[in-house]
Swiss-Prot record:
Originating organism: Homo sapiens
Residue segments, region Disordered: 32-79, 94-159, 344-388
Stated name of the protein: Migration and invasion-inhibitory protein
Post-translational modification: Isoform 2 is degraded by the ubiquitin-proteasome pathway.
Modified residues (Phosphoserine): 303
Taxonomic superkingdom: Eukaryota
Induction info: Up-regulated by IGFBP2.
Location of region: Interaction with IGFBP2: 239-282
Upper lineage: Eukaryota, Metazoa, Chordata, Craniata, Vertebrata
Biased composition (Polar residues): 138-152, 344-357
Length: 388
């Protein structure tokens, strides 16, 4: 019941969010319409700034917007002024509010003494020859730009308003976020709403009728799987089990409870290997086992385990506290030459006693002994340091 109430609250919150979305859509619609009207007003004002604003052009643009039911186009100035005022008022009433200001600015009469001329008289160099033909003049008279702009269809953004959703169809509608997750959950199950006594009785029934409640039939298998498992796997398959060498250098099974992946034969049921049918084993040896024991560093006293073990590396490290102290570098022998430990006089006597009898008077030329195992030492030249 608590979950149903939470689900209902989530749905109500979803409807409230939808209402807020509709209000935002209306605000966007209004802002788009306002921006379109401002852009049209700016375009019309820019066009008027580009064209010369003379009394003749302003009067001609307004005379074209006059109704064609007039009998004379070239009337007196006073009559034309009155007609222009009426036309301007009617045009202001019919145009949208974005263009009313521009039409009012054009509808104001300007004082001029000469009669207004048509646009054809401004373009043609000889207007006097065509004044007598009223028919072609009316056909050639261009329409005003304001009338053309008003007839153009403006792009408008429309949003389809969704109707109120009844509560019955809430479950069938796609929700957003947590509402979609809550809607996908099946909370109307009859089993979950049962009391605890129902489940206790069900458990007692299953315990008393255990044989009837548990299915003892083998699982059905596809015919293709039966054929493949009976023919190909048993004949050509060889079970391979994986082992790993531990620190005591004994092979340990990697997965002792896992049977063979193909024939599903456990490791315990596999018979001993023979020469005719040997058992195949895959053994993996870690690199830490293959390292020699002298490369193992002595552990710190807190982290070193001093308990007895059969592992070779740890057994070699048990005597880390009784290692002999390291000798200093100054006392260590620099080479393995035996002549270095004998004095110079003893060397001279040894060489003179073993000299040859054929040349007793000849002086003995002693060659410096060449050390066989020593590293030749080259004297470094002494360079005096300069005082700064």
């Amino acid at each position: 019941m608590v979950e149903a109430e939470e689900l209902a609250q989530l749905r109500l919150l979803n409807l409230e969010l939808l209402r807020q979305l509709w209000v935002g859509q209306d605000a966007v619609r209004r802002s788009v319409a306002r921006a379109a009207s401002e852009s049209s007003l700016e375009s019309s004002s820019s066009y008027n700034s580009e064209t010369p604003s003379t009394p003749e052009t302003s009067s001609t643009s307004l005379s074209t917007s006059c109704p064609r039911g007039r009998s004379s186009v070239w009337g007196p100035p006073d009559a034309c002024r009155g007609d222009l005022r009426d036309v301007a008022r009617s045009g202001v009433a019919s145009l949208p509010p974005a263009k009313c200001q521009h039409q009012e600015s054009l509808g104001r009469p300007r004082p001029h003494s000469a009669p207004s001329l048509g646009t054809s008289s401004l373009r043609d160099p000889e207007p006097s020859g065509r004044l007598g033909d009223p028919g072609p003049q009316e056909a050639q008279t261009p329409r005003s730009i304001l009338a053309q702009q008003s007839k153009l269809s403006k792009p408008r953004v429309t949003f389809s308003e969704e109707s109120a959703v009844p509560k019955r169809s809430w479950r069938l509608r796609p929700y957003l976020g947590y509402d979609w997750i809550a809607g996908s959950l099946d909370t109307s199950s009859s089993i979950t709403s049962q009391p605890e006594a129902f489940f206790s009785k069900l458990q007692e029934f299953r315990e008393t009728n255990k044989e009837e409640c548990i299915c003892s039939h083998p699982e059905p298998q596809l015919p293709g799987l039966r054929e493949s498992s009976g023919s190909g796997v048993e004949e050509d398959h060889e079970c391979v089990y994986c082992y790993r060498v531990n620190r005591r250098l004994f092979p340990v099974p990697v997965d002792p409870g896992t049977p063979c992946r193909l024939c599903r034969t456990p490791r315990d049921q596999q018979g001993p290997g023979t020469l005719a049918q040997p058992a195949h084993v895959r053994v993996s040896i870690p690199l830490s086992i293959l390292e020699p024991p002298h490369r193992y560093h002595i552990h710190r006293r807190k982290s070193f385990d001093a308990s007895d073990t059969l592992a070779l590396p740890r057994h070699c490290l048990l005597g880390w506290d009784i290692f002999p102290p390291k000798s200093e570098k100054s006392s260590a022998p620099r080479n393995l030459d035996l002549w270095s430990s004998v004095s110079a006089e003893a060397q001279h006597q040894k060489l003179s006693g073993t000299s040859s009898p054929f040349h007793p008077a000849s002086p003995m030329q002693m060659l410096p002994p060449t050390p066989t195992w020593s590293v030749p030492q080259v004297p470094r030249p002494h360079v005096p340091r300069q005082k700064p």
